[in-house]
Structure formats: structure tokens, C-alpha cells
Amino acid sequence: MKPSEIREMSIEEIDEKIRQLRLELAKERGMLTMGTSTENPMVIRNLRRDIARLLTIKKEKLREKR
């Protein structure tokens, strides 16, 4: 997910996307602990990075509102 795409979203949409990605991350981590290999081992890293991007841009937007 590109930062330019995230900046176009509203804060509510960002919150919803964060929730979705956190659920997906929990599912992937659960599969990993169960011993099931994932199709793509980079999925967990990419999910974590996307969540960090979303949180960073959300904070930027909240600072702008002040």
C-alpha cells in the first residue's frame, strides 16, 4: 500500500484498514505457530509495514487538524 493511497483515505477508513490488517496479521502468525507454512513468507513483514504506514499517516492527519 502506497503512502499516496493512504493519504487519500479518511481517518475512519484508515482505522478500518488497520483493523483488517491486524486481523490478517494475527491469522498469519497463528498459522506460523501451528506449523503451517505460509504461501509467501514476506506476508508478515509486509503487513507490519503497512500497519506502520497507516498509523504514521493517521498521526500526520491528526496533527494537521490541530
Swiss-Prot record:
PROSITE patterns documented for this protein = RIBOSOMAL_L29
Pfam families, alphabetized: Ribosomal_L29
CDD domains recorded for this chain?
Answer: Ribosomal_L29_HIP (cd00427)
Q: Which UniProt keywords apply?
A: Ribonucleoprotein, Ribosomal protein
Q: Which GO terms describe its molecular function?
A: structural constituent of ribosome
- What is the top-level taxon of the source organism? Archaea
Gene Ontology cellular-component terms for this entry are:
ribonucleoprotein complex; ribosome
Q: What processes does the entry annotate via GO biological process terms?
A: translation
Q: So what family is this one in? A: Belongs to the universal ribosomal protein uL29 family.
Q: What name does this protein carry?
A: Large ribosomal subunit protein uL29
